[in-house]
Amino acid sequence: CQFALFFYGRKILPEIGGRLLYAVDKTNGYDIFYRNSVVKPANVGMTGAWISGGVEWNAFHHHRQTSHIPCDWRIVDNRDGSKTIWLGETEYRHRMQWAIGITLRPGKSYMEISGRLINSTQNNNSMLYWSNVSTLVDENYQICFPQSTEFVTFHCKNWFAHWPVTHEPFNDMDFYKNGVDASWWKNHYMSNSMFIHDQKEDFVAGYDHGRHAGTMLVGNHNIIKGGKFWLWGPNSEWDTRILTDTSGHYCELMVGAYSDNQPDYNWSFPYESKEFTHYWYGIRDMGGVKAGSRHAALNLDRLSSDRVLVGANATEKYAKLTLELRHGDEVLYTRSGAMSPAEPMVDTVAVAS
């Protein structure tokens, strides 16, 4: 690639659609996104050439027609000491404009992703937006949807299944009716998409139990309405041979603004501007995710009949805070101390069986 921007541990390629190619959690060296060691286009995008890896910005159609074409960019120094790189273009189909701002703030481990979707025409136009976030996966990788997720659905909402354990055929595949824990990448024999049905919380995440690290995607679910994953599956060679040489399998954790499905177009009225904000960060050593915000991620897992894991990881340094586990009014566990992106709070706690 002839031109790239290195942005505090992140590599961004304006030359290839503004793709955020990789980002490293500097506390443990974990690649928050799937880092493809090669640029190896294949016939996937709307106009053909498409690469895997990092983050793809999909406006105003999925795998937009310019995802492999140079986009505009600008770096801004902000008054609080943060920096923002803006990426965007006037797209070819409707002559509408999109812009993505990636901001790194002093003392924060998250990337603040600001989106602007602008209809600068006098026409009512259809629009769809999804951030396509890829992560490295293997048999230890788990997709973490919010605990309130009861069902997942397919494209066009024409198949539904229970989550996380499926009990019905899904996308013409009968094996899902056999009690498959669909949160584990290894349990999907074929390529598939699963969308959260009726998103009620503000995050989608993935966790690698082998590397003890993961990726957290946070956004107001009233605006960031969509959450899904796409995978080629363990038996596919698309992601391991066609789209890369040696970088392995990946999964796509996608989050959609103003849309909860694909295709789920909404209308953009003449001269209307729509905006949204994400917060993305790496998590570590906490065994998964059950809840989270831009300030911290939390986990609670039952390890046995009488023990649970309690974990928390913050996005900034706190000299002292308190983590509590309660059952009704009863305090089962409390711990006070420092916490930071590099120092999560993780304990096992005895509970009644």
Features from the language model and the residues they span:
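Surface beta-strand/loop "capping" patches
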Residues: 285-318
